Amino acid sequence: MTEPERQLAEPSAAIEPRIVALVCTWCTYAGADLAGTSRLAYAPNVRIIRFPCTGRIDPLLVLKAFEGGADGVLVSGCHPGDCHYTSGNYHARRRWAIVRRLLEFTGIDSRRLYFSWVSAAEGRKFADLINEITAKVRAAGPFEPANPARRRPWT
């Protein structure tokens, strides 16, 4: 089998997913930092954007991430009850249940949005989470918007 035939037979092998992670500064970002300083291996194709709290993340940023070329989006913050701002993660949990319905309405498969809790001490969990999401998004294939002209290149 020639190389082009092999690539056509295994299209998912050539796909390197682009993932945007919208994370809490106090917990998940610190967990990502711990994963890095501990030299834990995780997929390099994630772009981390940190926020003071997941409760402060505007749902439109998820749509903007997909419009900007993301194949998957992770929203991650402090475990329930551990929020630096007392109730921000509870607010986020309620909000993201609604965002999933918004994604379905706009034609985006809600399985491309991931929500997780990662504390500052869970570097291994962060690395495993990123690897798991990367594998799932790779299996799902690249995100194809309804209007491809609106998708900007990933830079």
Please state what every model-predicted region is.
Residues 1-155:
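Iron-sulfur-associated redox domains of electron-transfer enzymes in respiratory
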